[in-house]
Amino acid sequence: MTENKSFKESHPLDDFISDKELSNTTIQKEKLTIEQQKQVDTISKQINPLDNEGLLAFGSDLQKQMSQFSHQMLDEVQSKDVGPIGDTLSDLMSKLKSVNPNELNTDKPSMLKRIFSRAKSSINEIFSRMQSVSAQVDRITIQLQKHQTHLTRDIELLDTLYDKNKQYFDDLSLHIIAAQQKKLQLENEKLPQLQQQAQQSTNQMDIQQVADMQQFIDRLDKRIYDLQLSRQIALQTAPQIRMIQNVNQALAEKIQSSILTSIPLWKNQMAIALTLMRQRNAVAAQRAVTDTTNDLLTANAEMLKQNAIETATENERGIVDLDTLKRTQRNIIETIEETLIIQQHGREERQLAEKELQQLEQDLKSHLVNIKGPNKQS
């Protein structure tokens, strides 16, 4: 491969990638440096008129190198599957999302039970799960770092391939210019000489030399076209290399962002969430204790008030209530009255019985007198 510097500060391939207009005639002879023009002249001398075998070999080494380069590019693309990198990043995002700080909200309707009993996701469970996920994230981070190292190496390799492609492009351009220069020389100098010689000569071989030269110029033109096709391949390969580099660079940046930003931020936010949750539970526990204390004080005050009122009321009462005395006196009076009535009734009954007994006694006496009288007369 011919070593030469770029034709200009801004390389044609870079212009092509930047969407600047570029064609096979972009690099003209007048844009060549003196050194490059010397290279073109040297290459042009390699083309010997009517040397068809030499013409066939002209630039073939460059085309073979381009073919090898294309195979190298194909192997690079086939061997570097970015799928596992995407899977690793997806796995990382899945792990980061598996622990949700919102799950740390353990508020319940009750008071002390809400604070001290087991909630749907206790802090210990969340913390344990976070530690497990953190360990998995650390392992994924190691994998991502390896991927990033490989991507960085691939980017450097692609830079080397890009530089090689630029060199192929430059060498092909020099060969194309040299061939075009030789073609113009043959068309403007050699062919007219042969044509003039054939016109002035009656030798049939002179006419054949004109035909052979014309065919050689046609083959040279075809060879220029083949080299231009190879040059076009180099031209199209440049943005392909850059696209692969851009994808690798984007993945490397994504990995770096995940390692240096996303993962530390996730760990910080989880630590903050756990700290805030502990603070919230501490405040809630303190609030519950305070509320319970206030409730107890209020209940005790109400009980004390009720006891004081009842005690004072009882102290102001006599040993026996007035109503009880009235009711008792009324019962005694009623008992006495009923007793007197019963006694009066008994007295009356006894008097009546006494009268009846006297009558009975009188009747008995009369009956006995009557019985004794007849007995005496007998």
UniProtKB/Swiss-Prot annotation:
Coiled-coil residue spans: none
Listed Pfam families: TelA
Signal peptide (residue range): none
Cysteines engaged in disulfide bonds, as pairs: none
Family classification: Belongs to the TelA family.
Miscellaneous comment as given in the Swiss-Prot or TrEMBL entry: Disruption of this gene leads to an increase in hla (alpha-hemolysin) transcription and proteases production.
Record-given protein name: TelA-like protein SAOUHSC_01408
Classification lineage: Bacteria, Bacillati, Bacillota, Bacilli, Bacillales
